[in-house]
Amino acid sequence: MAATAAGVFRRTPEERADQRLAWNRADQPFFAAGACHILAWVCRDTYPDRPIGLAGLRFAGERQVFHVYATWADRAFDHAGWNPEAELLAANREFERRSLDRIAIVDDMATFCQAQHHRMPHEYFGDPLSRARDYVNRHPLPWR
């Protein structure tokens, strides 16, 4: 699947206000907007023998991260599966029509979620960890 901007799947005001409605979205929109950080952490944790990192995107000069993804070599994993990171960055930059900053994420999930006002897994309507594990396992690996 081609790299696609996370903003294409941005939640509606209704989905932001209703966790059940947000939970019931298809997997790609769910992991593009609202649970991208869960997917990234699960991807990294699924392959502990690989040097998988975490990265985030934010609008240039701003503090708030709006999209999180896993990285390995020159590849990125998010709602669109594994793609060249350069393509993921270009798709998001083009969609947002703004400059973006890419940052490395080194905090644990709890620290990141608190600092960035993201939900922890237990704050979702259902279990996003098992849903993310299933989603990660559907995508071919770039190192094979």
Annotate each language-model stretch with its function.
Residues 1-144:
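A structural boundary/capping signal
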